[in-house]
Amino acid sequence: MRSVVLAAALAAGSAAYPAATPAQGDADAIGWLRAIYRATERLSYTGTFVYQHGEQVETSRITRIVDGSGVHERLEALDGTPREIVRVNEEVKCYLPQTMTLKIDRQLDTRPFPAMRADASELADRYAIRKGETERIAGYDCQAIVLEPRDNLRYGHKLWADLKTGMLVKAKTLNEKNEVVEQFAFTQLQIGGKIEKDQVKSRFAGKGRDWRIETAGVVAVDLTSLGWLLKSLPPGYRKVTEMRRSVGTRADVGHIVVSDGLAAVSVFIEPLSGQVRQGPGGLSRQGAVNVYTRTVDDHLVTVVGEVPAESVRLIADALEHRRP
């Protein structure tokens, strides 16, 4: 059954997209992708951005400092439910003042594109990559980079990077009809320069309030040794990270990250219990994010990603459990 679905998806992809010359892409455009990746890792910046998914629009302020002690970030929602996220290297703290909840987590893989390695040209196997127009955004002259998918198993993307630094200033995610399903754009931005450390400190920490603390334990683990295997992933996707998460009294949750080098998909594996019950399963969607759930050997499997519905379903179907 899985091979039939995969063949149908590939056939649909061939019909939906014009044939492209294989793998070469635009060398200059690929160079821009490398510049964006390097800039995201090394630059300090502060600014306000707007994020839109579906009909929801959110405005946030972010500050990031990269120095000799590592990476320090603070993200604050400026509308909607108050929330603040503070990151120091791998540790991430999420403050939810309305419920007086502090969630503490670890981010084992902090790269912006989880599977991207030194050779960004591998993306050209999965996307037709070209340079677009130049445009002024948030006071910066930016170069547009267009990534058109070569099949129906991934969304298209359009990225705008600052001409001088490579900083990603705007991004759009586009479906198979070339409709925008998700986008973000800075409306005010300072790249580099003097950014005070106080700007990456929580405004809630150390004020003596009684926060309810939820700490997630995150440990890198080989889930294959526990019998969980990903077989026959969709073309271009591969496993890049796997870990085990624990929160409070709930059973540990397995977490696998799958990526095609640009889009990331999370696979969560959680034992069914009184707290975790089997639902109807199947597909749901919010903006560019598709979610697919199924049960495998008394476990609830949830696959979440900014990829087409067919991709999350194929990734969910690829998961098998063999009792050790």
Which role fits each region the language model picked out?
Residues 136-207, 283:
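Gly/Pro-enriched, hydrophobic low-complexity segments
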Residues 42-48, 69-74, 139-146, 167-170, ...:
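Short, hydrophobic/aromatic-rich segments at coil-to-beta transitions
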Residues 108-157:
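Intrinsically disordered, low-complexity linker/loop segments enriched in Gly/Pro
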Residues 108, 148, 174-175, 246, ...:
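A generic structural motif
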Residues 2-7, 11-71, 79-80, 122-128, ...:
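N-terminal leader/targeting segments and the immediate start of mature chains
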Residues 58-59, 63-115, 170-193, 303:
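An acidic-aromatic
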Residues 40-42, 64-72, 86-91, 140, ...:
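Short, solvent-exposed coil/turn segments at beta-strand boundaries
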